[in-house]
Amino acid sequence: MNVSLFFEIYRDGGRYRWRLRYGAQILAESADAYNDKKACKALLEIVRDQSAGKPIVDTTGDP
């Protein structure tokens, strides 16, 4: 089974949002909705371009 990781732009109530998917599973999604598709895509491109190799920060305090 070939499941891929991808970003998706979709409509929600007439506004645009993005989400990160792994096959049918949603891993992350935008907190904000955008009236303009270009604005949504611009923010998504920043997330995509800046996220590779970033550290995981655990703020739970659990071992």
Language-model regions, residue ranges each:
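Short N-terminal "domain-start" leader segments
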Residues: 1-15, 29-30, 46-50, 55-58, ...
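A short, exposed loop/beta-hairpin motif centered on an aromatic-Gly-Thr core
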Residues: 25-36
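Extracellular/lumenal glycan-associated surfaces
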Residues: 14-26
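Residue-level recognition of oxygen-bearing side chains
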Residues: 39
